[in-house]
Amino acid sequence: MSAYAIIAASGVGKRMKLQGSLSKQFLQIGGFPVIYHTLSAFERSASVDSVFIATRQESIELLENMRDEYGFTKIAAIIPGGKERQDSIYNCIELIERQILDSGTAPDAILVHDGARPFIQPDEIDEIAALSAQYGACVPATKPKDTIKFISENDPGYFGRTLDRSRLLQVQTPQGFASKTLIQAHKHARLEQTYATDDAALVEEFFPEQHIRIHETGYHNIKITTPEDIHLAEAILAKLQSQQELTSSKKN
């Protein structure tokens, strides 16, 4: 099968409280930038043919240098992002649509991933891509560990009712969709100036008949959002590397 991946890497990282123009995608984990780990996973994916990155204008050269230094051969384009995450995704979608029109062929699925999620694994990417092609849409998720409550509608200083945790999932990326579905969802959103926090919400809005397949991943697929996440990420990386070394030694 064939899949394209869009990497959203334009985030400033306000909650990281970074100084100057430093982007959270370039913070170091295990001696390498966050975005390096992300791109490495997609480079090793068997199903992803091309990767399109939307980033800040001042980060384009950094990513081009990283592509050349580490031999990320699947990167098809590194382009400026937009004002919001959704605008950045749309910029990549426009480029992909032009490529589809020029070539006459479309990928079976398009995956959209947060650049600040460095620990998605190649086999997970392949599974999500396959399910997206089979069912039209697939989103990774994991079970919440904490009890979740509504805020009171009458007084925001108090809780409302408690949600049934057994029926809740924390949504992650990469989110995968049939090419036409994702492209059209973003076009509708652009036309109607509708914004959502993720791509699945746009598909839910404009293609309600499209059921979205759940693929449970794990707690390793975190998004780097706050300073505390860097320490957690170092621990996750160490565990993943230990597991990989153990698997490799067993094969040998």
UniProtKB/Swiss-Prot annotation:
Xref: CDD domains: CDP-ME_synthetase
Site, Positions MEP for the nucleophilic attack: residue positions: R165, K223
Catalyses which reaction(s): 2-C-methyl-D-erythritol 4-phosphate + CTP + H(+) = 4-CDP-2-C-methyl-D-erythritol + diphosphate
Metabolic or biological pathway, per its Swiss-Prot or TrEMBL entry: Isoprenoid biosynthesis; isopentenyl diphosphate biosynthesis via DXP pathway; isopentenyl diphosphate from 1-deoxy-D-xylulose 5-phosphate: step 2/6
Alphabetical UniProt keywords: Isoprene biosynthesis, Nucleotidyltransferase, Transferase
Lineage: superkingdom: Bacteria
Pfam families named in the record: IspD
GO process terms (BP): isopentenyl diphosphate biosynthetic process, methylerythritol 4-phosphate pathway
InterPro entries: IspD, IspD/TarI, IspD/TarI_cytidylyltransf_bact, ISPD_synthase_CS, Nucleotide-diphossugar_trans
Entry GO MF terms: 2-C-methyl-D-erythritol 4-phosphate cytidylyltransferase activity
EC number: 2.7.7.60
Site description Transition state stabilizer, residues in chain: R15, K24
Family to which the UniProt record says this protein belongs: Belongs to the IspD/TarI cytidylyltransferase family. IspD subfamily.
Known function: Catalyzes the formation of 4-diphosphocytidyl-2-C-methyl-D-erythritol from CTP and 2-C-methyl-D-erythritol 4-phosphate (MEP).
Protein name: 2-C-methyl-D-erythritol 4-phosphate cytidylyltransferase
Originating organism: Chlorobium phaeobacteroides (strain BS1)
Name of the encoding gene: ispD
